[in-house]
């Protein structure tokens, strides 16, 4: 047997091992693909995707930032110390087509303009430094000038920098379908149950990097699944099971929205309370990298 024959034999011996490794890789990839597709199908729910526009919204339009509707006989929302909150966003509910959400009136999100954007680390459902308000039939005789006269001119330039919204923007709505994000607290249990059920022998290996194959839930939206820069503050015991509103950091030619170091803001509500248009119990959170 010559030297060439020895090399040929070694190549033949090596090929089956390489093929076997390749087949294992392909098999694992196929399993991940199958699991991903099944989970996407099982978790798909409708949502409204939102985009900022450069239009000038009126007092009654959907908007991010700017001046929000306030009834004739009402004050701008304040915290327990008498400090006014600022309008984070206003939604014209006639633009929402999702089931169980209100389809008329105005839904507003107000937060305190401080260094934590109104976040309460001890109780993120206490509507003191943030407020969620719903006006089923807003009074169309209210004017923007009238509301502006109620605003306290007490914000310094330093305080102004804390507010996540830079300016005022309109909102464009589009119907979409959202699938579970790896940020959602239900993601791991959902994945684990399916993998252990269908692929018990490969479960641990498959679960290790499964979140790499799913979306993080970012973007502006109503309904759907949330995104977080760090983690979901909810747990399986939490009753705030619906994403009421999410506002992400957004950079155009310049930063339009910035939560801390490029974070995301979220508002959650219980499904039954949403159906009853009861916005007294809402969980507000935001986080950043």
Predicted features along the sequence, with ranges:
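Preference for intrinsically disordered or flexible, low-complexity segments
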Residues: 3-289
């Amino acid at each position: 047997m010559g030297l060439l024959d020895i090399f040929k034999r070694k190549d033949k011996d090596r090929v089956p091992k390489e093929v076997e490794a390749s087949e294992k890789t392909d098999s694992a990839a196929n399993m991940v693909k199958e699991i991903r597709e099944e989970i996407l199908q099982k978790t798909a729910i409708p949502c409204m995707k939102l985009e900022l526009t450069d239009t000038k919204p009126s007092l009654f339009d959907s908007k991010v930032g700017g001046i929000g509707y306030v009834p004739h006989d009402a004050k701008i929302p304040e915290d327990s110390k008498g400090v006014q909150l600022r309008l984070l966003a206003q939604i014209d509910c006639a633009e929402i087509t999702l089931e169980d959400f209100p389809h008329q009136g105005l839904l507003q999100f107000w937060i305190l303009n401080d260094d934590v954007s109104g976040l309460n680390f001890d109780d993120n459902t206490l509507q003191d430094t943030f407020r969620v308000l719903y006006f089923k039939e807003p009074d169309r005789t209210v004017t923007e000038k009238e509301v502006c006269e109620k605003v306290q001119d007490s914000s310094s330039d330093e305080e102004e920098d804390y507010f996540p919204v830079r300016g005022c923007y309109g909102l464009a709505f589009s119907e979409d379908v959202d699938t579970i994000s790896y940020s959602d607290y239900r993601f791991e249990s959902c994945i684990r149950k399916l993998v252990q059920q269908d692929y018990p022998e490969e479960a641990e290996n498959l679960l290790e990097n499964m979140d790499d194959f799913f979306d993080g839930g970012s973007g502006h939206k109503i309904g759907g699944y949330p995104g977080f820069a760090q983690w979901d503050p909810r747990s399986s015991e939490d009753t705030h099971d619906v994403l009421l509103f999410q506002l992400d950091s957004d950079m155009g030619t310049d930063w339009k929205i910035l939560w801390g170091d490029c974070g995301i803001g979220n508002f959650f509500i219980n499904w039954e309370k949403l159906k009853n248009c009861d916005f007294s119990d809402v969980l507000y959170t935001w986080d950043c990298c």
